[in-house]
């Protein structure tokens, strides 16, 4: 992985009681040792693979103002990180879920793009076996489950300040207002809505195939084609490019997909991030509620699975063997 660290700072927030978060600040930056680079590379990999929300700085953002000064050389990175950690502590203290943790600020370059990554990481306890086959306690940073993370694409921010996607952050776990306090700390508002873009794409694809008067099998083949392209982009960490997708769909209609989408006013960006959960709807139907969970391939609708909208009834012909076995045992009085 071609990742180069410019500056990296680490501080700590310790929760002493329900009201107070103690601030522990380093007096120097971390050295970019091999271990440190490996840790940042892992954090970059994990973060890049997760679904993120997109944002942009408000005009009043204190973090943006101090970051701009730091980028101009008017403040060093350590001082910037120490002041920002203090503001993060003040913001976190407003919320009852504040647990503290290690606060990481890392300015790094990956594939010619400069980033500033800000994360609050937890230290977890575990066990390890040493060379004598003894079991000893150990601690590790829980990078895989970090949910208080934001990343600023410094290159995009400085070259295209009107962009709505240079800042990304994780939404956090359900029931925790992680996004709320982090947006307040960053002084940012939500920008590009990736889910809305993906939903718009799905609607455009359905309308495109309908206008081309394709039969059911042909429509499903197009959906599978779109899903395959989008999933490849997702796996590669690339965005969905409308022009590239349109070339994939050449021959479906006399009108190109990009022309169709522009003419019909779907307001799709030229490129946007893929959203895994939304894209699954191209090939599957899924839903849950009231103790019922259903998931099936879209091609089965109208063949083995039938929906009557008048009665809201789903009829399934031919159940999976393991489900059928459970039903037979239960109805025959078995366990």
Curated annotation (Swiss-Prot):
One of its GO terms (molecular function) is double-stranded DNA binding. Pfam families: NA37 (PF04245). It comes from the Bacteria. Keywords: Cytoplasm. Transmembrane segments: none annotated. It is found in: Cytoplasm, Nucleoid. InterPro entries: Nucleoid_associated_NdpA. GO terms for cellular component: bacterial nucleoid; cytoplasm. Belongs to the YejK family. PANTHER family: NUCLEOID-ASSOCIATED PROTEIN YEJK, PTHR38772. HAMAP family: NdpA. This is Nucleoid-associated protein YejK. It comes from Shigella flexneri. The lineage of its organism: Bacteria, Pseudomonadati, Pseudomonadota, Gammaproteobacteria, Enterobacterales. The gene is yejK.
